């Protein structure tokens, strides 16, 4: 072949989705370069691994590249994209590059509106404990690995399948998981929920005849697509018709204790080192896949008991002092979470109530995208009204233009009318630490939450001397 790809360039390499693929390609021996608007821990890690990183986008950054990888967040007028077009360098969507990686191994793709990152991490951890040494590409940092991607020597690659832009339809895995189907990213589907469900049906059609669809039958929308799935199915969840089912579920000491009933295997007693019933569901998907791949029961149990979590998914920062008039006055427990859809937020609040019973729950929330705030406005009011104290910031736009009556102030006004919680509104995340310090008490549980820039706040809070 005359066109041999040796050098691959990533536009927006500092994002979690792009960086994972870039890291795997570095470890496969490719020359990798990339650019982003700012440096961060991800770009620093890739540079240490040997990738060439440029800060800022410029045509010269793609010099020598045989292919340029872009995500849907990259604009068509980006100077590197324009330069690639001018030089006839192939421009490859991120999902297509992930699909190429999947062609090298047997793919396990985790789809669903909520829970993808945690479920992907649990599957990768259980398979690793079973000696299968999978490659993984995750949308968050797997704490035990210190990274969101790893090149394994085994036959499997475990990755998230992104429905937000319908790019998961580029993937052709041998095992698929669908955790749930909910109304999010509806612009992609013309605000037609039937089109969204049809996309998930088409996703299952990507499986080969020997493939398996692992489906959570607790979710009514997943259950509705069952008749249209033409490949073998493993049903999981709490539902009586689940083939991998959790019973005797108890929350104790921030962990979930349950028994996994399996259709073709012995019951398995599990201690999951995560809180929340939604994480029991995520663990059941991992148990279903591990059982199918003949991972030993003891390895499944050990992996779930030792699971250290994923960055920004109910990530615990420990105890932080409460300062009052210049001196410490007790401490609060700090947790950070990526949740940005009302369903995810409700699951996290429920998990916190279960993990820390009887304690006051303080939430600092940054809404993500004006369109989501508009589309889920009443649901946001409902879930935010369930906490004991609230700091609310302006919406993180993610590049969107403001929408009238779908901003942070409108949300704060609606919450005051609802009358369940009095929000403290701040314009920027930089104001969150001071706003929290004015309301936090000894013994509180503080959760910082959102998919935007609020992710940098917990590290600032945790810099206070631990008690």
Curated annotation (Swiss-Prot):
The subcellular localization recorded is:
Cytoplasm
**This protein's pathway:** Cell wall biogenesis; peptidoglycan biosynthesis
Query: Which reactions does this protein catalyse?
Result: UDP-N-acetyl-alpha-D-muramate + L-alanine + ATP = UDP-N-acetyl-alpha-D-muramoyl-L-alanine + ADP + phosphate + H(+)
Q: Name one GO cellular component term.
A: cytoplasm
UniProt keywords, alphabetically = ATP-binding, Cell cycle, Cell division, Cell shape, Cell wall biogenesis/degradation, Cytoplasm, Ligase, Nucleotide-binding, Peptidoglycan synthesis
Q: Which InterPro entries match?
A: Mur-like_cat_sf, Mur_ligase_C, Mur_ligase_C_dom_sf, Mur_ligase_cen, Mur_ligase_N, MurCDEF_pg_biosynth, UDP-N-AcMur_Ala_ligase_MurC
Binding, ATP: 112-118
The EC number on file is 6.3.2.8
SUPFAM superfamilies attached here? MurCD N-terminal domain (SSF51984), MurD-like peptide ligases, catalytic domain (SSF53623), MurD-like peptide ligases, peptide-binding domain (SSF53244)
Main location per UniProt?
cytoplasm
Q: Name one Pfam family in it.
A: Mur_ligase_M
Biological process terms from the Gene Ontology for this record are: cell division; cell wall organization; peptidoglycan biosynthetic process; regulation of cell shape
Annotated family: Belongs to the MurCDEF family.
Q: What does this protein do?
A: Cell wall formation.
The name this protein goes by in its record: UDP-N-acetylmuramate--L-alanine ligase
Q: Which organism is it from?
A: Paraburkholderia xenovorans (strain LB400)
**What is the gene name?**
murC
């Amino acid at each position: 072949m005359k066109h041999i790809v040796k050098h691959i360039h990533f536009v927006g390499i500092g994002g979690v989705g792009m960086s994972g693929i870039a890291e795997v390609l570095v470890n496969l021996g490719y020359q990798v370069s990339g650019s982003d608007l700012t440096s961060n821990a991800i770009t620093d890690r890739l540079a240490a691994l040997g990738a060439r990183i440029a800060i800022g986008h410029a045509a010269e950054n793609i010099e020598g590249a045989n292919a340029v990888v872009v995500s849907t967040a990259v604009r068509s007028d980006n100077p590197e994209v324009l330069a690639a077009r001018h030089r006839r360098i192939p421009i490859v969507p991120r999902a297509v590059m992930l699909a190429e990686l999947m062609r090298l191994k047997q793919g396990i793709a985790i789809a669903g509106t909520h829970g993808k990152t945690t479920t992907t991490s649990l599957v990768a951890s259980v398979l690793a404990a079973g000696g299968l040494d999978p490659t993984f590409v995750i949308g968050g940092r797997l704490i035990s690995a210190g990274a969101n991607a790893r090149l394994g020597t085994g036959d499997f690659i475990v990755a998230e399948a992104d429905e937000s832009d319908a790019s998961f339809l580029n993937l052709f895995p041998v095992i698929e998981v669908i955790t749930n189907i909910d109304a999010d990213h509806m612009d992609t589907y013309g605000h037609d929920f039937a089109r969204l469900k049809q996309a998930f049906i088409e996703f299952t059609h990507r499986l080969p005849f020997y493939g398996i669809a692992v489906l959570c039958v607790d979710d009514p929308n997943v259950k509705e697509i069952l008749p249209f799935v033409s490949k073998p199915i493993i049903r999981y969840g709490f539902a009586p018709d689940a083939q991998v089912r959790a019973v005797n579920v108890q929350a104790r000491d921030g962990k979930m204790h349950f028994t996994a009933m399996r259709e073709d295997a012995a019951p398995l007693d599990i201690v999951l080192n995560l809180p929340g019933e939604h994480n029991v569901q995520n663990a059941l998907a991992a148990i279903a896949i591990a059982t199918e791949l003949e991972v030993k029961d003891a390895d499944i149990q050990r992996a779930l008991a030792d699971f250290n979590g994923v960055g920004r998914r109910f990530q615990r920062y420990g105890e932080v002092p409460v300062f009052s008039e210049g001196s410490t006055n007790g401490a609060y427990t700090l947790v950070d979470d990526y949740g940005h859809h009302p369903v995810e937020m409700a699951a996290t609040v429920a998990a916190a109530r279960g993990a820390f019973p009887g304690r006051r729950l303080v939430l600092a929330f940054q809404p993500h995208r004006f369109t989501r705030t508009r589309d889920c406005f009443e649901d946001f009011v409902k879930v935010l009204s369930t906490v004991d104290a609230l700091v609310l910031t302006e919406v993180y736009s993610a590049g969107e233009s403001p929408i009238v009556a779908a901003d942070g102030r409108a949300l704060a006004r609606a919450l005051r009318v609802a009358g369940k919680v009095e929000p403290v509104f701040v314009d920027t995340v930089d104001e969150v630490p001071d706003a929290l310090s004015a309301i936090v008490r000894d013994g509180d549980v503080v959760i910082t939450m959102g998919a935007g820039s609020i992710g940098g706040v917990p590290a600032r809070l945790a810099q206070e001397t631990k008690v």
